[in-house]
C-alpha cells in the first residue's frame, strides 16, 4: 500500500469514520466470557452545538472505550441527547418572537409541535459534530430523554415515588425567573458581583417614647422594595444594643402594619446596623428565620416581577425595580431614609435571561431526599462508587449531608408533563395516564397539571432508563452498573449524586463504579471560556481551520451586550492574525489527552495543537520510510530463516515494553496526560529520532540476517506503537496500520479490534539499553562538539575516543552516520595532548581531530564547569537534607549519590583540560 506523501487528516477522517460506523464496529461484541465495559455519555442538549468542554470529555471517554474494546471487553458507549427544557424552550420562543408570535397565544399543543419540529431540524447537529471528533458510540442505541421508552420510565418513577410518599406538593421558596416565569435550579443561577447600594431605613416604634417622632430601629438593606413584605426585624440575641427591645413592635414604613422585633443568631451584629429586616417570602435565609419564629410569609410580587395586591395600593402593578425607586423616594419624603452607602453585592441572575432571580413562594412538587441521600452516602463510603481524583468525594459527601428536598416541577411547556390530575374540587390523583387517573379518582372530568419536571429528573434516570428499565432487559443485566462516568465537578450534586440515589432506589445497583471528574477547559490565560469574554473556541474550527473574518463573525454574533463586539474583535485580531490553521481531529484529541491531568483547571494552548499536528506528520513520514524500506522485502515473517538482532533492535523492543507498561498504567489510573506523554516520547524521541536512524545504518549491512532482523523490528515495533496510540489518535493510526500490519504478520479488518499491546518484561534487555544509552551520549557529545566548533553539517571529521575498546566495538558504523564523522579511532590509552576540545561521557573522553580556537574552547569549558558546579550544589543540598535521606526511597538516595560522584569526577577532568589550555 502506497501512502500519500503528506498527511491529509480530513480525507482520512471522513473515510474511516464512515467505514467503522457502517461496519457496526461501535456496537458491543457480546463475545462469550468478555467483561462488560460501559460508559454513559452525559447527554448534551439536543439542539446544542459541540463546545470545547464536550470535545475534551468526549475525547477521554472515547479513548477509554477504544482501549477497553482492544482489551477484548464487551464495550458499550451509550449515546443520547437531553431535551433541555428551559434552553430549548427559550430558543423556540425567540424564533417565535422574531415572527411576531407568542407561545401563549399559540397554545400548548401548537407550541410543542413547533418545538418538536425544531428538534428534528437541529437535533442531529451535535451528534454529527461528535462523529467528527471520532466518538465511537453505539449510535444504533442512541436515546433522547423524551423518547417514548424513556418518557415511560420517567412516569413510572414519578408514580412509584409518589405512592411511596416521597413526592409531595408544597408551598416553599424557589429560585424564580420572572422572564421565563418558572422555577430554576441553582445551576441555572449565576451570581454576579455588582455595584449597588446599602440603604439605612428607620423603622419607628409602634409606641413612641420620649416624644421623638422618629425613634425606632435603623435597618440596612440592599433590596428596599421587598420591605413591603417584611414580617419582622431581627437582632442578635447577644447584641447589648438591642436586647432590651426584643419583643417590642415597629411600624412598617409605607404600610399600615406593625411587625415584631425578634432575636435570632442568624443576624451578624457587625453588618450594617445589626438590625435585619425579615421578609420570609422573598429571601431564603429569611424564610428559615420565619419558620423558626412562626412568621407567616407575605408575598408581594407577581410571577412576572411586579408588585401584587398584598402591597399598599400606590405600589401595586409597578415593576419591582420601579417600585424600588418609589420606595426610596417615599422614604426620603417621610424622613425615614437615614443614609445611602455604595455597596458591592452578589446579584443572582438567570444564566439564560440575565434577569435578576427572585426567591418566590410558590406551589411546587418536591421529592423528599433525606432517605435517598443516606443510601447515596453509604455506597461511596463503602467504596462501591469511587471518585477520581479522590478529593471530590468530600464535595459529594458535603452536598448530600446538607441536602434539601428537591423542587422537581417547572412552569414550562417543553418537558415531561407531571402525571397528576385534578378534579373540579382540586383533589389530586397521580397515575400513569388519564385512563388510570379516572379509575383511581372515580371522576370523569380531570385536568392534568400544567407543570413539567425538572430536566435533571429524567437525567437522573439515564444510566438505567437508556438500558430499557422498567423492563428487565438483557442490556440492563449486562451493563448496569456502568464502569465509569466522565463528567465535570460542577454537576456532582445536580446529576452525579441524583443518578446514584435514583439507581439505588429503583434497581438496587449503583449506576457506575467510578466517577472520573475532569478539570474545566479554560483559555491560555486561565479565563473561563464564554461568549461574553469573546474567548470561545469551536473544536471544529481547530479541526478544519477558520479564517480570521469568520472567527470574528462567530465571536461577535449573538452577544448579550453588543458593545463588547469591538474589544472582542480587537483581541481576536491580535491572537489570531491569520485565523486558525487546520490541525485535524487526531492532533486536537492528542492535545486534549495531554492536558487531562487531575487538576481542577486546564489551560488550553493552541501551540500544543501545532506540536501534536507535527507529531502526526512525523509518524506519517516515519511510516513512509518503513514502507519504502520494507514493502516487497523480507520482514522476518518466515520464522525458519535466521535473524541477527542488534543491540539497537533489542533496545527499541525493550523500550516498547516500557512504553506499553506506562500507557496501560496511565489509562487504568485515568492519567491521560501521562499516557499521551509516554506515547509521544516513545514514538518521537525513541523510535523516529533514534531507532529509525540506527536502522538506516543496519539496512546497509552486508549481513542478510541482520537486515531481516532490522526490517522485522522496524515494522513490528511500529505496528505495536500504532495500536498503543490508537485510543487517542484513532484516524491516523488506522490508516497507517492498514499499510504496516501485513508486513508484521497481522490480519484483520481494523485496528479497532486488534489486541491492545501488553508489556513483556522478559523482552527488556538491560545490557542493550545501557549500550544504546552510551551510544546516544557519545553521538550527542559529538554533535555538541561540532556545534561549538561551528562545523558545517556537511563537513565530516575524524573522532578520537579514549576508553575501553570492547564496549565501543560495534559503535563505529553508527557514529560515522549519526555524528557525520569521516573515521572513528578508539584509543585504549590517553588522547593526544593538544589544544582540541574534549567532551567527557562517563568513562570516555572524545576529541574531534581538528585545529582548535583556544579562546573559544576555554569559554566552552568554563560554561560546562559552571553547569556542573550548579548540579553538584543541588545534589549536595539534597543529600545534606535529613528529610530527604529519611523519606526518599533508598534507590533514589543512591541515584543522587551516584550523580554527585559523576558530576564531581567530570568537573575534575574538565578542570585538567582547562589548565592544559594555559
From Swiss-Prot:
One of its GO terms (molecular function) is ATP binding. A motif ('KMSKS' region) lies at residues 528-532. It is found in: Cytoplasm. It is an enzyme of class 6 (ligase). Keywords: Aminoacyl-tRNA synthetase, ATP-binding, Coiled coil, Cytoplasm, Ligase, Nucleotide-binding, Protein biosynthesis. It catalyses: tRNA(Val) + L-valine + ATP = L-valyl-tRNA(Val) + AMP + diphosphate. This is Valine--tRNA ligase. It comes from Nitrosomonas europaea (strain ATCC 19718 / CIP 103999 / KCTC 2705 / NBRC 14298).
Amino acid at each position: 500500500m502506497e501512502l500519500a506523501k503528506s498527511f491529509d487528516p480530513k480525507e482520512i477522517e471522513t473515510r474511516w469514520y464512515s467505514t467503522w460506523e457502517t461496519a457496526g464496529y461501535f456496537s458491543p461484541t457480546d463475545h462469550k466470557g468478555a467483561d462488560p465495559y460501559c460508559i454513559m455519555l452525559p447527554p448534551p442538549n439536543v439542539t446544542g452545538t459541540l463546545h470545547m468542554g464536550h470535545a475534551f470529555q468526549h475525547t477521554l471517554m472515547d479513548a477509554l472505550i477504544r482501549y477497553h474494546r482492544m482489551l477484548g471487553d464487551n464495550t458499550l458507549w451509550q449515546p443520547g441527547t437531553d431535551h433541555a427544557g428551559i434552553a430549548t424552550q427559550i430558543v423556540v420562543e425567540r424564533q417565535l418572537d422574531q415572527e411576531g408570535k407568542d407561545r401563549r397565544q399559540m397554545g400548548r399543543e401548537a407550541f410543542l409541535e413547533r418545538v418538536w419540529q425544531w428538534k428534528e431540524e437541529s437535533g442531529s447537529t451535535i451528534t454529527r459534530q461528535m462523529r467528527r471528533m471520532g466518538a465511537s458510540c453505539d449510535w444504533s442505541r442512541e436515546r433522547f430523554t423524551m423518547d417514548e421508552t424513556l418518557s415511560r420510565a420517567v412516569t413510572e418513577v414519578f408514580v412509584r415515588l409518589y405512592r411511596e410518599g416521597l413526592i409531595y406538593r408544597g408551598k416553599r421558596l424557589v429560585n424564580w425567573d420572572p422572564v421565563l416565569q418558572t422555577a430554576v435550579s441553582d445551576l441555572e443561577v449565576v451570581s454576579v458581583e455588582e455595584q449597588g447600594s446599602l440603604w439605612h431605613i428607620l423603622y419607628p416604634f409602634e409606641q413612641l417614647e420620649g416624644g421623638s417622632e422618629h425613634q425606632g430601629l435603623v435597618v440596612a438593606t440592599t433590596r428596599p422594595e421587598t420591605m413591603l413584605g417584611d414580617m419582622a426585624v431581627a437582632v442578635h440575641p447577644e447584641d447589648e444594643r438591642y436586647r432590651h427591645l426584643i419583643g417590642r413592635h415597629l411600624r412598617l414604613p409605607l404600610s399600615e402594619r406593625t411587625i415584631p422585633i425578634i432575636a435570632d443568631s442568624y443576624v451578624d451584629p457587625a453588618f450594617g446596623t445589626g438590625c435585619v429586616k425579615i421578609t420570609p417570602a422573598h429571601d431564603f435565609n429569611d424564610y428559615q428565620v420565619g419558620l423558626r419564629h412562626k412568621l407567616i410569609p407575605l408575598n408581594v410580587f407577581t410571577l412576572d416581577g411586579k408588585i401584587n395586591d398584598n402591597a399598599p395600593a400606590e405600589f401595586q402593578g409597578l415593576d419591582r425595580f420601579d417600585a424600588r425607586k418609589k420606595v426610596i423616594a417615599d422614604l426620603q419624603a417621610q424622613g425615614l431614609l437615614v443614609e445611602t452607602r455604595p455597596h458591592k453585592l452578589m446579584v443572582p441572575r438567570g444564566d439564560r435571561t440575565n434577569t435578576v432571580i427572585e426567591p418566590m413562594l410558590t406551589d411546587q412538587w418536591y421529592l423528599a431526599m433525606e432517605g435517598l441521600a443516606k443510601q447515596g452516602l453509604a455506597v461511596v463510603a463503602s467504596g462501591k462508587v469511587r471518585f477520581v481524583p479522590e478529593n471530590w468525594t468530600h464535595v459529594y459527601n458535603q452536598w448530600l449531608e446538607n441536602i434539601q428536598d428537591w423542587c422537581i416541577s417547572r412552569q414550562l411547556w417543553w418537558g415531561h408533563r407531571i402525571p397528576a390530575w385534578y378534579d373540579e374540587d382540586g383533589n389530586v390523583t397521580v397515575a400513569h395516564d388519564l385512563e388510570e387517573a379516572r379509575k383511581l379518582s372515580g371522576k370523569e372530568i380531570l385536568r392534568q397539571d400544567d407543570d413539567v419536571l425538572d430536566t435533571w429528573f429524567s437525567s437522573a434516570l439515564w444510566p438505567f432508563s437508556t438500558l430499557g428499565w422498567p423492563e428487565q432487559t438483557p442490556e440492563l443485566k449486562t451493563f448496569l452498573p456502568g464502569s465509569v462516568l466522565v463528567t465535570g465537578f460542577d454537576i456532582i450534586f445536580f446529576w452525579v449524586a441524583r443518578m446514584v440515589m435514583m439507581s439505588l432506589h429503583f434497581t438496587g445497583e449503583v449506576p457506575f463504579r467510578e466517577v472520573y471528574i475532569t478539570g474545566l477547559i479554560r483559555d491560555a490565560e486561565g479565563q473561563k471560556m464564554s461568549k461574553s469574554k469573546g474567548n470561545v473556541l469551536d473544536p471544529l474550527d481547530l479541526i478544519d481551520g477558520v479564517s480570521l473574518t469568520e472567527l470574528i463573525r462567530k465571536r461577535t454574533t449573538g452577544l448579550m451586550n453588543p458593545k463588547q463586539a469591538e474589544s472582542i474583535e480587537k483581541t481576536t485580531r491580535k491572537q489570531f492574525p491569520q485565523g486558525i490553521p487546520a490541525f485535524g481531529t487526531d492532533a486536537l484529541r492528542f492535545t486534549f489527552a495531554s492536558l487531562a491531568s487531575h487538576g481542577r483547571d486546564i489551560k488550553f494552548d493552541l501551540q500544543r495543537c501545532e506540536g501534536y499536528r507535527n507529531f502526526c506528520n512525523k509518524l506519517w513520514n516515519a511510516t513512509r520510510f518503513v514502507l519504502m524500506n520494507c514493502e516487497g522485502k523480507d520482514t522476518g515473517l518466515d520464522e525458519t530463516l535466521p535473524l541477527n538482532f542488534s543491540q539497537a533492535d533489542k533496545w527499541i523492543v525493550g523500550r516498547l515494553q516500557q512504553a506499553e507498561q506506562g500507557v496501560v498504567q496511565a489509562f487504568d489510573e485515568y492519567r491521560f496526560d501521562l499516557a499521551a506523554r509516554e506515547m509521544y516520547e516513545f514514538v518521537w524521541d525513541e523510535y523516529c529520532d533514534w531507532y529509525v536512524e540506527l536502522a538506516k545504518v543496519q539496512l546497509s549491512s552486508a549481513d542478510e540476517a541482520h537486515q531481516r532482523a532490522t526490517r522485522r523490528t522496524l515494522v513490528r515495533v511500529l505496528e505495536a506503537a500504532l495500536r498503543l496510540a490508537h485510543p487517542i489518535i484513532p484516524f491516523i493510526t488506522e490508516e497507517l496500520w492498514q499499510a504496516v500490519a501485513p508486513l508484521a504478520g497481522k490480519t484483520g479488518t481494523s485496528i479497532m479490534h486488534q489486541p491492545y499491546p501488553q508489556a513483556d518484561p522478559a523482552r527488556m534487555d538491560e545490557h542493550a539499553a545501557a549500550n544504546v544509552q552510551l551510544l546516544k551520549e557519545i553521538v550527542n557529545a559529538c554533535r555538541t562538539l561540532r556545534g561549538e566548533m561551528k562545523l558545517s553539517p556537511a563537513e565530516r571529521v575524524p573522532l578520537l575516543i579514549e576508553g575501553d575498546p570492547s564496549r565501543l566495538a560495534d559503535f563505529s558504523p553508527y557514529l560515522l552516520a549519526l555524528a557525520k564523522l569521516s573515521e572513528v579511532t578508539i584509543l585504549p590509552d590517553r588522547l593526544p595532548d593538544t589544544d582540541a576540545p574534549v567532551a567527557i561521557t562517563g568513562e570516555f573522553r572524545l576529541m574531534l581531530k581538528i585545529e582548535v580556537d583556544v579562546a573559544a574552547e576555554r569559554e566552552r569549558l568554563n560554561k560546562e564547569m559552571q553547569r556542573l558546579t550548579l548540579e553538584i550544589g543541588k545534589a549536595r543540598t539534597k543529600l545534606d537534607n535529613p528529610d530527604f535521606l529519611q523519606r526518599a526511597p533508598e534507590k533514589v538516595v543512591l541515584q543522587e549519590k551516584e550523580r554527585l560522584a559523576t558530576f564531581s569526577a567530570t568537573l575534575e577532568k574538565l578542570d585538567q583540560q582547562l589548565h592544559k589550555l594555559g
